[in-house]
């Protein structure tokens, strides 16, 4: 379709999107065939530039604050028109995709991007249906115009870029953002608001299935191991980041994966390694003189990424869904070296740690956090993406866990034997051993040891994991230093949890001083 002197490219094939991106100088090819692009000064999400339109139909249901920032409806309309006019004056790309693999819960989305590579990214991460919108639902629009520059004084934005969600109009406006992760997380936020009304728990988690049909969920912030640990050659991948849990089903909200690439190796992450080929997008990955990706080079960012469709994963769930989970794993990257490699949680502890979302920002996906790592609490293991009050998601989680009798575990992928800079990080093989034990059922009914202060129960033995690692105090040379660190971490948990209005049973399930 042609408008004035420009062309609208609609539903191009992957091959054609790659060709357009190369012809327009948007990226180059790696030796694997993946398209390599740079995103400029924004190499992660920009949470200070994310807004939700404040309008009557949803205003009372949203937890407004520093994460969910209000944007005036009239300002949104003016800015949408301005960005759309800017985009319509030049070539752009349109694809029709779905968000949500379950037939009852998909959203039809018209995705419009200024660049070919961001359209390819959307085709990697969203679902490319055999038939678009068979149920005839109202369509969502994503308008992503990377080279538009917002003017805060005129547009009401925080900077030269913005991400704005309008639930009433079913629109997502992304302007001035070359980092493509904003697009997937915006639609995740949309589903995170909509799904609870349908009695579905939206989750920032990965999911996979065993040969026997058993499903495991991996909750966790970026860098804690969701993508790596769920990409298991012995199991079928459902997805690596965004899922819904309804009665009888866990389904992927997406159709692809968005893997961190820092220090990626074929040995430790063979599934991801093999998926980075023609049709995949590498963001902010440095190539050597032979067009070979140097995943150890962090000169552009520690948050280098690979986007690829699930079709690039040989062993996957064909329909992007599975049954309810036998095992629910909360991944935490503990910088203090206090938490054990695995703890077995009861329902109240599950609610406590889900609401707390304790972990570290590791090679953070957020702008302004720098390359360093620091401890953080992120409610629901994904606070930036959940528009409703946290308690609503926690109630749904407990309802689902009780309904299916799912077993819940807290797994530390962080430090042992001392805090960051003193101890060492658990190796991926060690953590994989913990995960394998959980998935085999070996920890159900296992004999446990109670850890005071942090108030957790740890198994006394885990197949293929060194027994001395299981009680973290034993891994510290200075036991008194461990006790001091444990009290310090408990204090952080207690202070963070003061903001939650929950039952005494849930409050008592956390660390105690």
Swiss-Prot record:
PROSITE patterns: PEPCK_ATP. This is Phosphoenolpyruvate carboxykinase (ATP). Binds 1 Mn(2+) ion per subunit. Its main location: cytoplasm. Its cofactor is Mn(2+). Belongs to the phosphoenolpyruvate carboxykinase (ATP) family. One of its GO terms (biological process) is gluconeogenesis. PANTHER family: PHOSPHOENOLPYRUVATE CARBOXYKINASE (ATP), PHOSPHOENOLPYRUVATE CARBOXYKINASE ATP. Pathway: Carbohydrate biosynthesis; gluconeogenesis. Gene3D superfamilies: 3.90.228.20, Phosphoenolpyruvate Carboxykinase, domain 1 (3.40.449.10), Phosphoenolpyruvate Carboxykinase, domain 2 (2.170.8.10). InterPro entries: PEP_carboxykinase_ATP, PEP_carboxykinase_C, PEP_carboxykinase_N, PEPCK_ATP_CS. The gene is pckA. It comes from the Bacteria. Substrate binds at residues 45, 179, 185, 305. Signal peptide: none annotated. It is an enzyme of class 4 (lyase). Its EC number is 4.1.1.49. NCBIfam families: pckA, PRK09344.1-2, PRK09344.1-3, PRK09344.1-5. Involved in the gluconeogenesis. Catalyzes the conversion of oxaloacetate (OAA) to phosphoenolpyruvate (PEP) through direct phosphoryl transfer between the nucleoside triphosphate and OAA. GO terms for cellular component: cytosol. Monomer. It is found in: Cytoplasm. It comes from Pseudomonas entomophila (strain L48). Pfam families: PEPCK_ATP. It catalyses: oxaloacetate + ATP = phosphoenolpyruvate + ADP + CO2. GO terms for molecular function: ATP binding; metal ion binding; phosphoenolpyruvate carboxykinase (ATP) activity.
